[in-house]
Design a protein with these regions (language model features):
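Specific transmembrane alpha-helical segments of multi-pass solute transporters/efflux pumps
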Residues: 23, 60-95, 136, 227-243
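Hydrophobic alpha-helical transmembrane segments of multi-pass integral membrane proteins
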Residues: 9-13, 38-55, 129, 154, ...
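Helix-helix packing/entry segments at the starts of transmembrane helices
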Residues: 98-102, 173-192, 229-265
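C-terminal transmembrane-helix exit sites in multi-pass transporters
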Residues: 57-58, 103-128, 257-276
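Hydrophobic/aromatic residues within transmembrane alpha-helices
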Residues: 31, 41, 87, 99, ...
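Juxtamembrane helix-loop boundary signature in multi-pass membrane transporters
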Residues: 1-15, 108-161, 171, 176, ...
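Membrane-interface helix-cap regions at the ends of transmembrane helices
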Residues: 4, 49-66, 132-147, 192-218, ...
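Juxtamembrane C-cap of transmembrane helices in multi-pass membrane transport proteins
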Residues: 19-35, 82-91, 99, 113, ...
Length: 313
């Protein structure tokens, strides 16, 4: 393998990871059509992902340490996964995704209080830009208020809030527990998502098992999604550890492109001009945030790209 190909592999890893996250909503809808609810799908796919990480990276289990931040990571990962899965199953995929992508605004606020990072004027401006984009997208002449109009959109918003918190807590864990490998933080994320999804499914009621041949199909899809989630996280961690943070953030935005295209092809969802404009503000804020925060720790210190994980599909 020549140097040019080897050098492009980390970028390709992030690109593939973003594409997978942009497409994963579709098999979740197939599961829903087979009778597997969003909460149950969240629990089962996360359980498969958790087991996959534990088995594939079993040598890192010895680095697991206790800290109060780990339950926080587990809970926020659970809310993130459940909100994203439920929202993309029951709502307009692109709108849910864009509400989720308000993450930079919430991250700036959380990091100020939990990581003692100074909230600069630039950071506050980017937060305002992304929130303004969401208000533009959500504004309706009939409703009069720029608020999520459906439970699915509220779920997407909650997922973004929780994802931002889980990101901040993962960074804090990497600082407090530098000896704990990133794979164990990823396992904590998936384990928390599995437990939270299982608890939530109890309140939703136990659905009837898919009948006949549908049961085998549902099991195969659940296992495939879970393994894909875990593999995708490990793949993206490989890329983020070797690509500058500002460049990686730009590549990750490809997820929105894939989401928009797949929503158009598979769900016949076409955003309005106002939704495109609001989405553009959110994407721009995400893009610029990588430049505002481009002063990242050195790759051999805690908090580098290897700490990045996403316990959601």
């Amino acid at each position: 393998m020549n140097n040019a190909v080897r050098g492009s592999l980390p970028t390709l890893a992030i690109l593939v990871g973003a594409s997978v996250w942009g497409l994963i909503w579709y098999p979740l809808r197939i599961l829903a059509s087979l009778g597997v609810t969003g909460t149950l799908a969240s629990a089962l796919t996360s359980l498969v992902a958790f087991l996959f990480v534990i088995v594939a990276r079993h040598r890192t289990i010895a680095t697991l340490r206790w800290h109060w931040v780990l339950p926080g990571i587990a809970v926020t990962a659970g809310v993130t996964n459940l909100g994203f899965v439920w929202g993309t199953i029951h709502g307009e995929v692109l709108r849910v995704m864009l509400l989720f992508y308000l993450t930079p605004a919430w991250t700036a606020i959380y990091a100020h209080f939990l990581l003692r990072e100074r909230l600069t004027w630039a950071g506050a401006g980017l937060a305002a830009l992304s929130i303004g984009g969401a208000m533009l997208m959500l504004w309706s002449p009939t409703l009069g208020l720029p608020l999520p109009a459906t439970p699915a959109e509220w779920a997407g918003l909650a997922a973004g809030l929780s994802f931002a918190m889980s990101n901040v807590l993962v960074i804090k864990a990497s600082r407090e527990l530098p000896e704990m490998r990133a794979e164990m933080r990823t396992a904590t994320l998936f384990g928390g998502a599995a437990v939270f999804g299982a608890i939530a499914s109890l309140f939703e009621g136990i659905p009837a098992a898919p009948a006949g041949g549908h049961l085998g199909t549902a099991v195969l899809i659940i296992v495939a999604i879970g393994v894909t989630m875990a593999s995708n996280n490990l793949l993206v961690q490989y890329g983020l550890a070797r690509v500058p943070a500002n460049r990686a953030s730009i590549i990750m935005l490809f997820e929105i492109v894939i989401t928009a295209l797949s929503a158009w092809v598979f769900a016949n969802e076409l955003p309005s001009a106002r939704e495109w404009a609001g989405g553009a503000c959110i994407v721009l804020a995400t893009l610029l945030s990588s430049r505002v925060h481009r002063a990242a720790p050195a790759p051999d210190k805690p908090g580098d790209g290897r700490d990045a994980a996403r316990a959601m599909v």
